[in-house]
């Protein structure tokens, strides 16, 4: 950014930090008084007018003060922000929460969304690992009523998915056990994304052609793996509704719609899967119209070098970036260690 002088950056930083704290449009007198600048209010006023012309500030109709734009927050995050470390007490509090969550991956991820919400005071969000990105460990068919079968799928990272399927014919419990044993022997250690290929290869096997039960086992397993819908955990939506900029009913409605239409959020989080480290989307950068006025800070969590999913915090564009960025970063690293069994 070469279009803004150091003095103007200093004043813009002061305005942004005041607005983050107060949620009120910031005037020139407040900037000089709160930040001890050796500049007159008139000089600051002129700078604010310049910053508005450059697209960093806007003037609400009802106020003489100014409000930062998405462009201002982007400059703030990229160039002006001093990110602080999480203090020892906060780190211990986060680790203790995970100790209470146990080792079940679903419980860990659900607790992560709650923790991110409670520590940041905004909304915590976690995209669970896609089953197709894991390694197959175990499948079990459980007979329910009629032709309904509960399929329990287990991945090498501990992810468990339960799926209900309707079979074309009825099987006994003994037949389902034999089918499960056959598939477990065939598929253990195979990447889930390659399971269908392995199944199609096996269907050409002469043994399968003459064993109807094995053929049906392969068909059932393919049916079971057909749905790889994303699982997303969201906690603390009401924290955003308590922010003054979301007080009017239209903004509130849009916000609820954004959280209800999870496919759009999943699409945004999917974009983060190929990026390492913390990602920050400010306002319009999310490309989600219903998330106007919101920012999202995310980071991937991993096992080894394999990206499993994404976690993060959604808050107003005036969120406390200096506090939230290290929380998201630390939590992602801690979740990665937990899932690796450290």
Swiss-Prot record:
Asked if the keyword Transcription regulation belongs to this entry, the reply reads yes
**InterPro entries, alphabetized:** GAF-like_dom_sf, HrcA, HrcA_C, WH-like_DNA-bd_sf, WH_DNA-bd_sf, WHTH_HrcA_DNA-bd, WHTH_transcript_rep_HrcA_IDD
UniProt record, GO biological process: negative regulation of DNA-templated transcription
GO MF term set: DNA binding
UniProt keyword annotations, A-Z: Repressor, Stress response, Transcription, Transcription regulation
Where does the source fall among the domains of life? Bacteria
Please describe what this protein does.
Answer: Negative regulator of class I heat shock genes (grpE-dnaK-dnaJ and groELS operons). Prevents heat-shock induction of these operons.
Q: Which NCBIfam families match?
A: hrcA
Q: Which family does it belong to?
A: Belongs to the HrcA family.
Q: What's the protein here called?
A: Heat-inducible transcription repressor HrcA
């Amino acid at each position: 950014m070469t279009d803004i002088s150091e003095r103007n950056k200093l004043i813009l930083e002061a305005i942004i930090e005041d607005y983050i704290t107060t949620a009120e449009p910031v005037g020139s007198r407040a900037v000089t008084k709160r930040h001890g600048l050796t500049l007159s209010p008139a000089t600051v006023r002129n700078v604010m007018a310049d910053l508005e012309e450059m697209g960093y500030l806007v003037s609400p109709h009802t106020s003489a003060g100014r409000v930062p734009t998405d462009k201002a927050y982007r400059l703030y995050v990229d160039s002006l922000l001093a990110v602080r470390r999480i203090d020892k007490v906060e780190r211990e509090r986060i680790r203790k929460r995970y100790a209470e969550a146990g080792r079940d991956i679903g419980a860990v991820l659900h607790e992560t969304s709650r923790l991110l919400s409670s520590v940041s005071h905004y909304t915590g969000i976690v995209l669970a690992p896609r089953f197709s990105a894991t390694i197959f460990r175990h499948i079990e068919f459980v007979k329910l009523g009629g032709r309904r079968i509960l399929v329990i799928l287990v991945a090498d990272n501990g992810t468990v998915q339960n799926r209900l399927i309707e079979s074309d014919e009825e099987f006994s419990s003994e037949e389902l056990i034999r089918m499960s044993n056959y598939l477990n022997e065939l598929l253990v250690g195979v990447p889930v994304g390659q399971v269908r290929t392995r199944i199609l290869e096996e269907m050409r096997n002469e043994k399968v052609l003459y064993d109807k039960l094995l053929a049906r086992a392969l068909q059932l397993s393919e049916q079971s793996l057909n749905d790889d819908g994303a699982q997303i955990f969201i906690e603390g939506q009401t924290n955003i509704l308590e922010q003054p900029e979301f007080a009017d009913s239209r903004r509130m409605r849009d916000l609820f719609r954004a959280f209800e239409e999870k496919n759009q959020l999943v699409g945004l989080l999917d974009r983060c899967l190929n990026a390492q480290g913390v990602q920050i989307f400010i306002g319009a950068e999310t490309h989600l119209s219903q998330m106007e006025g919101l920012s999202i800070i995310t980071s991937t969590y991993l096992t080894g070098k394999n990206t499993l999913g994404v976690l993060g915090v959604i808050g107003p564009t005036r969120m406390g970036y200096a506090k939230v960025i290290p929380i998201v970063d630390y939590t992602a690293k801690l979740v990665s260690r937990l899932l690796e069994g450290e």
